[in-house]
Amino acid sequence: MLGKKSDFTIHPINVLQDNIVWVWVHNCNAVVVDPSISGPVEKWLLEKNLSLKAILQTHHHDDHIGGTQKLIKTWPEAKVVASKKEHKRIPFQTFSVDDNDIFNLMDAEIKVIEVHGHTDNHIAFYISKQNAKCNILFPGDTLFGGGCGRLLEGSPVQMFESLYKLNSLPENTEIYPAHEYTESNLKWALSLEPGNISIIERLKLIQKKLQKGMSSLPSTLSEERKTNLFLIAENVEKFTMLRKHKDRWKC
């Protein structure tokens, strides 16, 4: 159980091949982030006797919205929060947001951060430390453990600028990505920087966790600043070179 503020907790539900659906719980209520499929999420919520208050959608891909419509059939009062620019691709949204919007859920203030790159109109959700013991970021497919999302719709410049935005958050921000890619990303980073002690140590640590059936996530922004080559790329040219190299790389 993570991200505590009294009974404020965040839980992972592992689905599909490598997706993670994060469930943020406060008292008897829950918020779900990017539900790929409905079955495991619905089962988990019902077993815990939780009421679904909202679903946060970072972008339109099926492995992020695939379970939403079934979940809102079970909990029709739940809000579906998504970018107002994505009405066509997320037509079932009921609470539309834009860059820098701030809204409240379950006694927490959430800020919307527009992060183009992986897709157009991709958004991230940020909860500041005044509402929890640490800052919390749900970046969707923009920022991963040791990596970033592929550029499926956006440009290198857009993704570089999006990562710059996220890198400006406080270093104690906990990062809750939507995929378990950390091991592969760190192996790739180590292939480029084989003497990087921070990457070596982090890879060993998360491999031990994975061997025990644990998740490598969440990470922290502080940790990513030491080991995420995309996040610390000094310019767009360097970022573009890294992204092209990663796209061709095979573990």
Curated annotation (Swiss-Prot):
Superkingdom of origin: Bacteria
A GO biological-process term: methylglyoxal catabolic process to D-lactate via S-lactoyl-glutathione
EC category: hydrolase
Cofactors demanded by this protein: Zn(2+)
Positions contributing to Zn(2+) 2 binding: 63-64, 141, 179
Keywords: Hydrolase, Metal-binding, Zinc
Pathway participation: Secondary metabolite metabolism; methylglyoxal degradation; (R)-lactate from methylglyoxal: step 2/2
GO molecular function per UniProt: hydroxyacylglutathione hydrolase activity; metal ion binding
Reaction(s) the record says it catalyses: an S-(2-hydroxyacyl)glutathione + H2O = a 2-hydroxy carboxylate + glutathione + H(+)
Similarity comment: Belongs to the metallo-beta-lactamase superfamily. Glyoxalase II family.
HAMAP family assigned to the protein according to its UniProt record, in alphabetical order: Glyoxalase_2 (MF_01374)
Subunit-level organization: Monomer.
Record function comment: Thiolesterase that catalyzes the hydrolysis of S-D-lactoyl-glutathione to form glutathione and D-lactic acid.
Name of the molecule in the record: Hydroxyacylglutathione hydrolase
Lineage summary: Bacteria, Bacillati, Cyanobacteriota, Cyanophyceae, Synechococcales
